[in-house]
């Protein structure tokens, strides 16, 4: 989704390369990166070696490093008879300079390939620097000599006999060929045996499978009443009203970022859809909550839900019908992915639990939540063609097993939590656009997972009209088609026309609108106050202006204005203030990674060797800089980092910086000096007793480029010189006698190898993205007001390469349609490290505490007898609504007489009856006429209800063995048995449950968790169902993915 002032204009037909040389933008191995067409914030330094529309060849890098005096390359000019000018054919070939007079000796010394190159070079004019001053006679004489030399060389080569040198050369080449051939044979054999061993190791579906027709909603019992009400309403709607509900009115054509048209005859209102995952975007008097990645770091289910409740409450008070969050795609397959911070962590169970709790919290207020982005939106590069100047968005190619076990798992949990809406993503999946991918939307989401709500597109993610409707899309957002704010929708009047001419069945349109209306009833929004003119309901803020009066249609020039901002304070007050939950989440989401000699927590009654404690604060991440809202959608890295950038952000009502909080943190007098810059001298730290150094790493959505980062990070290092800053401070703090505490604010994992083991680094806190209460929450942990109880939601490796080849962002197009192949996506994050026996710096789930805990007495008890397959899919509890599908008179779809349309506003009306006559449409998607049977894995919300039967209980004793209150996160991992019937690879172990428990010193408590059938199953591609393998499962219980002291069999 673009910034509010986005104006795409015409697309540039060239690419530019960014070679800015600084710590934040330097690319891996010095490679240039493909950069987007939008301008960078701040402005990037453009490379002089931009690739233009004209054809040219770049110099070889090694050749470029040579002196220009050694080589001179001259193209031949060929006259053009058409325009009198010249067309140039350019080739760069180094000029061969004579090092002596023995030309024949030289020719003998070069390879046959070089001889052939010389013979072909006669079409070019090679010259050294002095050639520009040669006379015509000299040039003619030189050409004559060259021809004679070439003739003699050819004769000499014909007469040349074999020599021992020739034989040696042939044997060497033959040996190389044999070695390469043997290596290929060995490689092929190993690949074959690995494939045999893994059995259903799934290769990408290229192209994506098809699944038609789109399943109807209204088949689950707990949605029955809502669908009954929706049926009564939809039955009385006109075709125009149905289309109006399914199509947005256009970008900036309403108060919210997304607005649907109303159905006025049946009194169904326009719906307001608003970002997002961190709070209400573009709204006043709302809370800037900690980001999703910080929430995931709490591993606290209660806080996850409380945060969701507060977000839903604010959306309700602001008149928002649909909140566009939580974000659970990307899941973090690529650690440098730009939007990973919006989600909760790089594990499907952690992501799924956090998503479900957030959704339940949001929807407890009657606000519809949105699970996004479905599916495989793992990187920002090439997600949209118009952002990058390519013809088509990239394709994320993934196998069926990884799709189910990793990427779709959190969405299944969201549907079990009754999420009202699912947003499809920008890119393609297995070479079919996600918002028209019938296998994903119809087959997996609506049939297998039993989704009863509506599917909406990401903003401009819809890339077709008919195919997207048939493929399972229910709502087009924001209504615009292929370009922003041009008033040309792929639906709107085009959907009206397609239904009338039978290209799209009326039955499909009825299901689309029924799903939307049923969700509206499911969360009792029919009881909300009616919007004007009947009441004072609807959105009470404008996304496009901060003034009380503004345009009603900011994307048009119609001149209509009204009071658009009522400044309703939605943040809560007193003990109900949402800042309280924001501070709790930020504090519990802070992860203690290192703590030498109990450096932390700090004492508020501090003193130094000389009496007064001398404290130094280092790094611009400690201070407020220009303020939290200095850049649109937080699209710059300045001051303390409290959020990433993009549509998932929020306008901060305030931001407490670490420096502001530190100024009032100590009870005794301290001498505190702040150096709010990332370049300090040793003298700046030499006289300090305590050095607090702050550094960060930022990223965000692909429509913004900031600091040389085009959405996705270029690497995993700290930005703006943060690593150098830490090394300098840690090496010189107190002339080696002081203590250095490092605080990191980051969107994801950062590589710490250059400083983590320095003796001067005594403690490290990863504060993630803490939101508006950043400084206050940090003080709570830094001074021990609360325990350090955060745990890593991802693995911190020692290098980006350790995460594997498939975890790397594709920075350069590798095909006209960029292809990202995720063949080993099953082994995401810590699973990859386990699979290849790589020791990370800090493993998934890791985090230190200010106290100590002991786990003991693990018991695993069987609750159900094992069976390979779940019970059969149950029959639908209720039948979906049925309607009369008779087409109306096309004349009723024309603009009403005297109607004055708003410029660029998207209407369902037709300007004429052209194209409305029923016709035989012949461009349907592949296999459209083949009806698919129901999936055996379906039958309920989130899948077959049998998958969620509890198979085993896990109990363990947890004791606080320290001297202060603290919280422990108990994590349960499962290792699958080796099924001899179907040989298949499993991850070493996978997270399957967790709980967080708070204990007083010496307190002991038993905690219990359960494992479901799905927890103990894998997705069988052959059977298209979840299968429990035969044999004993190993159950591990501990504190992280690699600290698992207890184990038992099941």
Curated annotation (Swiss-Prot):
Q: How does it sit in the membrane?
A: Single-pass type II membrane protein
Q: What is its main location?
A: membrane
Compositional bias of kind Basic and acidic residues:
11-20
Q: Which domain of life is it from?
A: Eukaryota
What GO molecular-function term can you cite, just one?
beta-glucosidase activity
* Skewed-composition ranges (Polar residues): 78-87
Its keywords, alphabetically, are:
Carbohydrate metabolism, Cell membrane, Cellulose degradation, Glycoprotein, Glycosidase, Hydrolase, Membrane, Polysaccharide degradation, Signal-anchor, Transmembrane, Transmembrane helix
List locations, semicolon-separated: Cell membrane
Q: What class of enzyme is it?
A: hydrolase
Annotated PANTHER family: BETA-GLUCOSIDASE (PTHR42715), BETA-GLUCOSIDASE E-RELATED (PTHR42715:SF20)
What does this protein do, in the record's words?
Beta-glucosidases are one of a number of cellulolytic enzymes involved in the degradation of cellulosic biomass. Catalyzes the last step releasing glucose from the inhibitory cellobiose.
Would you tell me the protein name for this molecule? Probable beta-glucosidase E
- Which organism is this entry from? Aspergillus clavatus (strain ATCC 1007 / CBS 513.65 / DSM 816 / NCTC 3887 / NRRL 1 / QM 1276 / 107)
């Amino acid at each position: 989704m673009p910034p509010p002032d986005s104006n795409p204009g015409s697309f540039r037909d060239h690419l530019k390369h960014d070679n800015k040389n600084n710590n934040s933008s330097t690319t891996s191995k010095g490679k240039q990166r493909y950069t987007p067409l939008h301008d960078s914030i701040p402005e990037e330094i453009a490379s002089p070696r931009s690739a233009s529309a004209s054809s040219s060849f770049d110099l070889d890098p090694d050749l470029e490093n040579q002196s220009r005096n050694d080589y001179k390359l001259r193209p031949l000019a060929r006259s053009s008879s058409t325009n009198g000018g010249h067309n140039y054919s350019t080739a760069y070939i180094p000029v061969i300079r004579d090092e002596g007079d023995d030309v024949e000796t030289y020719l003998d010394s070069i390879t046959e390939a070089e001889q052939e190159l010389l013979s072909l070079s006669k079409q070019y004019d090679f010259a050294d620097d002095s050639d520009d001053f040669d006379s015509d006679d000299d040039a003619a004489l030189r050409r004559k000599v060259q021809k004679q030399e070439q003739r003699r060389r050819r004769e000499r080569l014909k007469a040349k006999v074999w020599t021992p040198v020739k034989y040696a050369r042939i044997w060497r080449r033959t040996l190389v060929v044999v070695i390469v051939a043997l290596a290929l044979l060995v490689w092929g054999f190993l690949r074959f045996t690995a494939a045999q061993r893994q059995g259903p190791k799934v290769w990408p579906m290229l192209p994506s499978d098809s699944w038609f027709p789109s399943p109807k909603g209204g088949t689950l019992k707990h949605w029955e009443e809502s669908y009954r009400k929706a049926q009564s309403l939809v039955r009385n709607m006109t075709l125009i009203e149905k289309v109006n509900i399914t199509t947005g009115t256009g970008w900036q054509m309403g108060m919210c970022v997304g607005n649907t048209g109303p159905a006025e005859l049946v009194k169904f209102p326009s719906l307001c859809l608003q970002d997002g995952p961190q709070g209400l975007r573009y709204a006043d008097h709302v809370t800037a909550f900690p980001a999703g990645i910080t929430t995931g770091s709490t591993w606290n289910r209660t806080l996850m839900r409380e945060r969701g409740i507060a977000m839903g409450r604010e959306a309700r008070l602001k008149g928002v019908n649909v909140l566009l969050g939580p974000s659970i795609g990307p899941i973090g397959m690529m650690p440098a992915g730009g939007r990973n911070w919006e989600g909760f962590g790089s594990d499907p169970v952690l992501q799924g639990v956090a998503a479900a709790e957030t959704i339940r919290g949001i929807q407890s207020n009657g606000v519809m939540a949105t699970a996004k982005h479905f599916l495989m939106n793992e990187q920002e590069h090439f997600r949209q063609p118009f952002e990058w100047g390519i013809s088509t968005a990239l394709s994320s190619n993934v196998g069926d097993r990884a799709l189910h076990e990793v990427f779709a798992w959190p969405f299944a949990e969201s549907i079990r939590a009754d999420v009202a809406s699912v947003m499809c993503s920008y890119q393609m999946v297995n070479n079919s656009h996600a918002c028209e991918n019938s296998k994903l939307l119809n087959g997996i989401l609506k049939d297998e997972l039993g989704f009863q709500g509506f599917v909406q597109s990401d903003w401009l993610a819809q890339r077709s009209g008919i195919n997207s409707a048939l493929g399972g899309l229910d709502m087009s957002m924001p209504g615009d088609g292929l370009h922003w704010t041009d008033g040309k929708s792929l639906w709107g009047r085009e959907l009206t026309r397609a239904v009338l001419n039978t290209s799209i069945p009326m039955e499909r349109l009825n299901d689309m609108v029924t799903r939307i209306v049923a969700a509206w009833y499911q969360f009792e929004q029919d009881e909300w106050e009616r919007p004007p003119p009947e009441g004072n309901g609807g959105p009470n803020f404008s996304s496009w202006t901060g003034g009380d009066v503004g345009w009603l249609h900011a994307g048009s020039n119609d001149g209509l204005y009204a009071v658009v901002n009522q400044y309703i304070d939605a943040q809560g007050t007193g003990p109900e203030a949402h800042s309280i939950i924001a501070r709790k989440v930020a504090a519990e989401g802070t992860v203690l990674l290192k703590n030498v000699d109990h450096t932390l927590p700090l004492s508020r009654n501090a003193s130094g060797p000389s009496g007064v404690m001398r404290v130094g604060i280092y790094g611009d991440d400690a201070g407020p800089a220009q303020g939290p809202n200095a850049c649109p959608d937080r699209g710059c890295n300045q001051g303390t980092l409290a959020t990433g950038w993009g549509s998932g952000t929020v306008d901060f009502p305030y931001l407490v910086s670490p420096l502001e909080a530190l100024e009032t943190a100590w009870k005794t007098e301290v001498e505190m000096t702040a150096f709010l810059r990332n370049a300090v001298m040793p003298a700046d730290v030499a006289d300090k007793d305590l050095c607090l150094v702050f550094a960060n790493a930022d990223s965000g959505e692909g429509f913004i480029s900031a600091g040389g980062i085009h959405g996705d990070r270029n690497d995993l290092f700290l930005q703006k010189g943060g690593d150098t800053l830490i090394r300098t401070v840690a090496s010189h703090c107190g002339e080696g006698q002081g203590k250095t505490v490092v605080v990191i604010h980051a969107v994801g994992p950062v590589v710490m190898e250059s400083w983590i083991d320095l003796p001067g680094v005594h403690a490290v806190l990863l504060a993630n993205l803490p939101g508006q209460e950043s400084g206050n929450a940090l003080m709570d942990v830094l001074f021990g007001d609360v325990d350090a109880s955060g745990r890593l939601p991802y693995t911190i490796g020692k290098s980006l390469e350790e995460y594997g080849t498939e975890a790397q962002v594709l920075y350069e197009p590798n095909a006209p349609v960029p292809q990202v192949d995720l063949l080993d996506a099953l082994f995401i994050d810590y699973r990859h490290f386990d699979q290849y026996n790589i020791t990370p710096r800090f493993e998934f789930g890791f985090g230190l505490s200010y106290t100590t805990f002991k786990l003991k007495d693990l018991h695993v008890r069987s609750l159900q007898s094992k069976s390979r397959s779940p019970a059969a899919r149950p029959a639908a509890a209720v039948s979906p609504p049925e309607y009369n599908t008779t087409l109306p008179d096309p004349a009723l779809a024309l603009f009403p007489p005297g109607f004055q349309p708003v410029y660029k506003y998207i209407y369902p009306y037709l300007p004429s009856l052209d194209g409305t006559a029923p016709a035989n449409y012949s461009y349907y998607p592949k296999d459209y006429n083949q009806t698919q049977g129901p999936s055996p894995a379906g039958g309920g919300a989130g899948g077959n209800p049998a998958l969620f039967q509890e198979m085993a209980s896990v109990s363990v004793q947890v004791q606080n063995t320290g001297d202060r209150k603290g919280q422990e996160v108990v994590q349960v991992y499962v290792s699958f048995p080796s099924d001899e019937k179907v040989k298949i690879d499993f991850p070493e172990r996978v997270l399957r449950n967790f709980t967080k428990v708070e204990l007083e010193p010496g307190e002991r408590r038993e905690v219990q968790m359960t494992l479901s059938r799905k927890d103990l199953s894998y997705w069988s591609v052959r059977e298209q169902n979840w299968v429990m393998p035969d044999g004993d499962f190993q159950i591990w219980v501990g504190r992280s993915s690699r600290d698992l002291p207890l184990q038992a069999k099941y």
